[in-house]
Protein backbone atom coordinates (compact mmCIF):
# COMPACT_ATOMS: atom_id res chain seq x y z
CA UNK A 1 0.00 0.00 0.00
CA UNK A 2 1.52 3.23 -1.12
CA UNK A 3 1.85 5.98 1.34
CA UNK A 4 1.71 9.64 0.40
CA UNK A 5 3.81 12.09 2.27
CA UNK A 6 2.06 15.34 2.86
CA UNK A 7 4.38 18.28 2.72
CA UNK A 8 3.61 20.97 5.23
CA UNK A 9 2.29 24.13 3.59
CA UNK A 10 4.31 27.19 4.25
CA UNK A 11 2.67 30.55 4.16
CA UNK A 12 4.53 33.74 3.52
CA UNK A 13 3.96 36.34 6.11
CA UNK A 14 3.65 39.81 4.66
CA UNK A 15 6.35 42.07 5.91
CA UNK A 16 4.99 45.00 7.79
CA UNK A 17 5.77 48.31 6.17
CA UNK A 18 8.40 50.40 7.78
CA UNK A 19 7.31 53.12 10.07
CA UNK A 20 6.41 56.21 8.08
CA UNK A 21 6.38 54.41 4.73
CA UNK A 22 2.59 53.97 4.72
CA UNK A 23 2.01 57.69 5.10
CA UNK A 24 4.45 58.59 2.33
CA UNK A 25 2.87 59.22 -1.11
CA UNK A 26 3.82 56.74 -3.86
CA UNK A 27 6.95 57.69 -5.74
CA UNK A 28 8.27 59.95 -3.01
CA UNK A 29 11.64 59.02 -1.59
CA UNK A 30 12.51 59.20 2.03
CA UNK A 31 15.05 61.81 3.05
CA UNK A 32 18.29 60.00 3.68
CA UNK A 33 20.37 61.67 6.32
CA UNK A 34 23.64 61.30 4.48
CA UNK A 35 26.55 63.72 4.97
CA UNK A 36 25.86 65.26 1.58
CA UNK A 37 22.23 65.90 2.52
CA UNK A 38 23.19 67.54 5.78
CA UNK A 39 25.77 69.64 3.97
CA UNK A 40 23.18 70.86 1.45
CA UNK A 41 20.62 71.69 4.12
CA UNK A 42 23.27 73.45 6.19
CA UNK A 43 24.17 75.61 3.18
CA UNK A 44 20.52 76.47 2.55
CA UNK A 45 20.00 77.32 6.21
CA UNK A 46 23.12 79.50 6.29
CA UNK A 47 21.94 81.37 3.20
CA UNK A 48 18.52 82.11 4.69
CA UNK A 49 20.02 83.14 8.03
CA UNK A 50 22.35 85.52 6.21
CA UNK A 51 19.51 86.91 4.06
CA UNK A 52 17.10 87.34 6.97
CA UNK A 53 19.85 88.92 9.05
CA UNK A 54 20.47 91.58 6.40
CA UNK A 55 16.76 92.34 6.01
CA UNK A 56 16.21 92.55 9.76
CA UNK A 57 19.19 94.85 10.24
CA UNK A 58 17.91 97.23 7.53
CA UNK A 59 14.40 97.27 9.03
CA UNK A 60 15.72 97.88 12.54
CA UNK A 61 18.02 100.61 11.26
CA UNK A 62 15.07 102.34 9.59
CA UNK A 63 13.15 102.32 12.88
CA UNK A 64 15.95 103.22 15.29
CA UNK A 65 16.35 106.71 16.70
CA UNK A 66 19.93 106.12 17.88
CA UNK A 67 21.93 102.94 17.42
CA UNK A 68 25.54 102.93 18.57
CA UNK A 69 27.46 99.98 20.04
CA UNK A 70 24.42 97.90 21.06
CA UNK A 71 22.38 95.06 19.63
CA UNK A 72 19.21 97.15 19.32
CA UNK A 73 18.52 100.89 19.09
CA UNK A 74 17.69 102.76 22.26
CA UNK A 75 14.37 103.99 20.84
CA UNK A 76 12.15 103.11 17.90
CA UNK A 77 10.30 105.56 15.68
CA UNK A 78 8.57 105.78 12.30
CA UNK A 79 9.69 109.36 11.79
CA UNK A 80 12.44 108.30 9.38
CA UNK A 81 9.83 107.06 6.91
CA UNK A 82 7.94 110.35 7.05
CA UNK A 83 11.20 112.27 6.65
CA UNK A 84 12.28 110.13 3.67
CA UNK A 85 8.84 110.52 2.09
CA UNK A 86 9.13 114.31 2.25
CA UNK A 87 12.87 114.62 1.65
CA UNK A 88 13.08 112.49 -1.49
CA UNK A 89 9.56 112.91 -2.86
CA UNK A 90 8.80 109.23 -2.55
CA UNK A 91 5.29 109.61 -3.98
CA UNK A 92 6.72 110.98 -7.23
CA UNK A 93 9.52 108.39 -7.30
CA UNK A 94 7.13 105.47 -6.83
CA UNK A 95 4.76 106.94 -9.42
CA UNK A 96 7.59 107.29 -11.95
CA UNK A 97 8.75 103.74 -11.21
CA UNK A 98 5.30 102.26 -11.80
CA UNK A 99 4.71 104.41 -14.90
CA UNK A 100 7.99 103.32 -16.46
CA UNK A 101 7.37 99.67 -15.59
CA UNK A 102 3.81 99.56 -16.95
CA UNK A 103 4.75 101.41 -20.15
CA UNK A 104 7.70 99.10 -20.78
CA UNK A 105 5.50 96.05 -20.19
CA UNK A 106 2.78 97.19 -22.61
CA UNK A 107 5.19 98.11 -25.42
CA UNK A 108 7.31 94.98 -24.90
CA UNK A 109 4.26 92.71 -25.11
CA UNK A 110 2.79 94.49 -28.15
CA UNK A 111 6.10 94.22 -30.01
CA UNK A 112 7.49 91.00 -28.58
CA UNK A 113 4.52 88.65 -28.94
CA UNK A 114 4.05 89.15 -32.73
CA UNK A 115 7.81 88.91 -33.22
CA UNK A 116 7.89 85.69 -31.19
CA UNK A 117 5.07 84.31 -33.34
CA UNK A 118 7.07 84.98 -36.51
CA UNK A 119 10.12 83.24 -35.07
CA UNK A 120 8.03 80.26 -33.94
CA UNK A 121 5.85 79.78 -37.03
CA UNK A 122 7.69 81.22 -40.02
CA UNK A 123 10.87 80.24 -41.85
CA UNK A 124 12.94 83.01 -43.40
CA UNK A 125 16.61 83.71 -44.19
CA UNK A 126 18.96 84.42 -41.27
CA UNK A 127 16.34 83.31 -38.75
CA UNK A 128 18.94 81.76 -36.43
CA UNK A 129 21.15 84.85 -36.67
CA UNK A 130 18.25 87.12 -35.74
CA UNK A 131 17.42 84.89 -32.78
CA UNK A 132 21.01 85.14 -31.57
CA UNK A 133 20.91 88.93 -31.94
CA UNK A 134 17.82 89.04 -29.73
CA UNK A 135 19.75 87.15 -27.08
CA UNK A 136 22.56 89.70 -26.87
CA UNK A 137 20.75 92.38 -24.76
CA UNK A 138 19.56 89.65 -22.40
CA UNK A 139 22.96 88.01 -21.94
CA UNK A 140 25.27 91.03 -22.07
CA UNK A 141 25.83 93.24 -19.01
CA UNK A 142 23.64 96.34 -19.36
CA UNK A 143 26.56 98.72 -18.89
CA UNK A 144 28.22 97.44 -22.10
CA UNK A 145 25.46 98.81 -24.31
CA UNK A 146 24.08 101.32 -21.81
CA UNK A 147 26.81 103.91 -22.39
CA UNK A 148 26.32 104.02 -26.20
CA UNK A 149 22.55 104.18 -25.63
CA UNK A 150 22.96 107.06 -23.20
CA UNK A 151 25.17 108.89 -25.71
CA UNK A 152 22.48 108.54 -28.37
CA UNK A 153 19.78 109.76 -25.98
CA UNK A 154 21.74 112.86 -24.97
CA UNK A 155 22.60 113.65 -28.60
CA UNK A 156 18.88 113.47 -29.44
CA UNK A 157 18.05 115.81 -26.58
CA UNK A 158 16.23 113.13 -24.57
CA UNK A 159 18.72 112.86 -21.72
CA UNK A 160 17.37 113.05 -18.15
CA UNK A 161 13.79 112.60 -19.39
CA UNK A 162 11.10 109.99 -18.77
CA UNK A 163 11.05 109.09 -22.47
CA UNK A 164 14.74 108.17 -22.38
CA UNK A 165 14.22 105.97 -19.32
CA UNK A 166 11.43 104.08 -21.07
CA UNK A 167 13.36 103.69 -24.34
CA UNK A 168 16.54 102.32 -22.77
CA UNK A 169 14.56 99.83 -20.67
CA UNK A 170 12.85 98.56 -23.82
CA UNK A 171 16.19 97.42 -25.26
CA UNK A 172 16.51 94.37 -22.98
CA UNK A 173 12.78 93.95 -22.29
CA UNK A 174 11.53 93.39 -25.86
CA UNK A 175 14.08 90.62 -26.60
CA UNK A 176 13.29 89.13 -23.20
CA UNK A 177 9.59 88.84 -24.12
CA UNK A 178 10.51 87.39 -27.52
CA UNK A 179 12.78 84.75 -26.02
CA UNK A 180 10.16 83.89 -23.39
CA UNK A 181 7.20 83.64 -25.76
CA UNK A 182 8.86 81.84 -28.69
CA UNK A 183 9.09 78.38 -27.04
CA UNK A 184 5.66 78.96 -25.51
CA UNK A 185 4.10 79.51 -28.95
CA UNK A 186 5.97 76.52 -30.39
CA UNK A 187 4.19 74.25 -27.89
CA UNK A 188 0.74 75.25 -29.19
CA UNK A 189 -0.63 72.82 -31.76
CA UNK A 190 -0.52 74.46 -35.23
CA UNK A 191 -3.57 72.39 -36.24
CA UNK A 192 -5.74 74.79 -34.24
CA UNK A 193 -4.68 77.70 -36.45
CA UNK A 194 -4.96 75.65 -39.64
CA UNK A 195 -8.50 74.61 -38.79
CA UNK A 196 -9.49 78.24 -38.22
CA UNK A 197 -7.96 79.33 -41.52
CA UNK A 198 -9.72 76.52 -43.37
CA UNK A 199 -12.98 77.79 -41.90
CA UNK A 200 -12.35 81.19 -43.49
CA UNK A 201 -10.95 83.10 -40.50
CA UNK A 202 -8.46 85.84 -41.25
CA UNK A 203 -5.07 86.01 -39.58
CA UNK A 204 -6.17 88.85 -37.31
CA UNK A 205 -9.14 86.82 -36.08
CA UNK A 206 -6.96 83.74 -35.59
CA UNK A 207 -4.44 85.70 -33.58
CA UNK A 208 -6.87 87.69 -31.40
CA UNK A 209 -9.62 85.13 -30.77
CA UNK A 210 -7.85 81.77 -30.93
CA UNK A 211 -4.19 82.26 -30.07
CA UNK A 212 -4.59 85.13 -27.62
CA UNK A 213 -6.56 83.12 -24.99
CA UNK A 214 -3.95 80.36 -25.20
CA UNK A 215 -1.11 82.88 -24.90
CA UNK A 216 -2.51 84.69 -21.86
CA UNK A 217 -0.57 82.60 -19.27
CA UNK A 218 2.69 83.09 -21.15
CA UNK A 219 2.06 86.80 -21.64
CA UNK A 220 1.34 87.25 -17.94
CA UNK A 221 4.49 85.36 -16.99
CA UNK A 222 6.61 87.44 -19.39
CA UNK A 223 4.97 90.65 -18.15
CA UNK A 224 5.74 89.87 -14.52
CA UNK A 225 9.37 89.06 -15.33
CA UNK A 226 9.71 92.30 -17.30
CA UNK A 227 8.10 94.19 -14.42
CA UNK A 228 10.59 92.85 -11.89
CA UNK A 229 13.48 93.42 -14.29
CA UNK A 230 12.46 97.01 -15.05
CA UNK A 231 11.85 98.02 -11.44
CA UNK A 232 15.26 96.64 -10.47
CA UNK A 233 17.16 97.94 -13.51
CA UNK A 234 19.82 100.35 -12.23
CA UNK A 235 22.52 100.76 -14.88
CA UNK A 236 20.42 101.79 -17.88
CA UNK A 237 18.06 103.98 -15.86
CA UNK A 238 20.87 105.72 -13.99
CA UNK A 239 22.68 106.68 -17.20
CA UNK A 240 19.73 108.61 -18.70
CA UNK A 241 17.48 109.61 -15.78
CA UNK A 242 17.23 112.95 -14.00
CA UNK A 243 15.66 114.39 -10.82
CA UNK A 244 12.14 114.06 -12.24
CA UNK A 245 12.65 110.69 -13.94
CA UNK A 246 14.52 108.66 -11.32
CA UNK A 247 13.10 105.28 -10.43
CA UNK A 248 13.19 104.01 -6.87
CA UNK A 249 16.45 102.07 -7.14
CA UNK A 250 18.24 105.07 -8.71
CA UNK A 251 16.81 107.44 -6.09
CA UNK A 252 18.29 105.24 -3.35
CA UNK A 253 21.71 105.39 -4.99
CA UNK A 254 21.55 109.18 -5.41
CA UNK A 255 20.61 109.56 -1.75
CA UNK A 256 23.59 107.43 -0.72
CA UNK A 257 26.05 109.42 -2.84
CA UNK A 258 24.62 112.90 -2.31
CA UNK A 259 26.98 115.83 -1.76
CA UNK A 260 28.30 116.10 1.77
CA UNK A 261 28.75 112.38 2.38
CA UNK A 262 25.22 111.24 1.58
CA UNK A 263 22.02 111.31 3.58
CA UNK A 264 21.48 109.92 7.05
CA UNK A 265 21.71 106.15 7.20
CA UNK A 266 18.20 105.60 8.65
CA UNK A 267 16.79 107.63 5.75
CA UNK A 268 18.54 105.35 3.27
CA UNK A 269 17.35 102.28 5.17
CA UNK A 270 13.79 103.61 5.06
CA UNK A 271 13.99 103.95 1.28
CA UNK A 272 15.47 100.45 1.03
CA UNK A 273 12.58 99.04 3.06
CA UNK A 274 10.07 100.80 0.80
CA UNK A 275 11.83 99.34 -2.25
CA UNK A 276 11.88 95.84 -0.73
CA UNK A 277 8.20 96.00 0.22
CA UNK A 278 7.33 97.18 -3.30
CA UNK A 279 9.16 94.24 -4.86
CA UNK A 280 7.56 91.80 -2.41
CA UNK A 281 4.08 93.10 -3.25
CA UNK A 282 4.83 92.62 -6.95
CA UNK A 283 6.01 89.05 -6.37
CA UNK A 284 3.02 88.19 -4.17
CA UNK A 285 0.62 89.47 -6.82
CA UNK A 286 2.51 87.56 -9.50
CA UNK A 287 2.42 84.29 -7.58
CA UNK A 288 -1.24 84.87 -6.76
CA UNK A 289 -2.38 85.10 -10.36
CA UNK A 290 0.32 83.16 -12.20
CA UNK A 291 1.04 79.52 -11.39
CA UNK A 292 3.94 77.92 -13.31
CA UNK A 293 2.27 74.51 -12.92
CA UNK A 294 -1.00 75.69 -14.46
CA UNK A 295 0.91 77.48 -17.23
CA UNK A 296 2.73 74.30 -18.26
CA UNK A 297 -0.46 72.22 -17.95
CA UNK A 298 -2.40 74.62 -20.16
CA UNK A 299 0.25 74.55 -22.87
CA UNK A 300 0.37 70.74 -22.70
CA UNK A 301 -3.41 70.48 -23.06
CA UNK A 302 -3.41 72.77 -26.09
CA UNK A 303 -0.60 70.70 -27.63
CA UNK A 304 -2.50 67.45 -27.09
CA UNK A 305 -5.67 68.89 -28.61
Named regions from a protein language model:
Residues 31-32, 102-134, 151, 287-288:
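Transmembrane-helix boundary motif in ABC transporter permease subunits
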Residues 37, 99, 125-131, 194-221:
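Amphipathic cytosolic juxtamembrane alpha-helices at the membrane-cytosol interface
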Residues 91, 95, 99-111, 115, ...:
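Hydrophobic alpha-helical transmembrane segments of multipass integral membrane proteins
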Residues 42-43, 48-55, 178-181, 189, ...:
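Transmembrane alpha-helices
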Amino acid sequence: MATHTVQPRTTKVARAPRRGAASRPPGQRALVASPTTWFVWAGVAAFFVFLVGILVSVVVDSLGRSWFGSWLPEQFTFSWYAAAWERFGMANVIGVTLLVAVTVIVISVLVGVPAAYLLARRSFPFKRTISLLFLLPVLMPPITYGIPLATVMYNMGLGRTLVAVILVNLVPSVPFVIMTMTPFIEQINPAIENAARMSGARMRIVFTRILAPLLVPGILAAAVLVLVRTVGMFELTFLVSGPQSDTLVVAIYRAMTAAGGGESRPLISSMAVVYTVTMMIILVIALRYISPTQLVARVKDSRDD
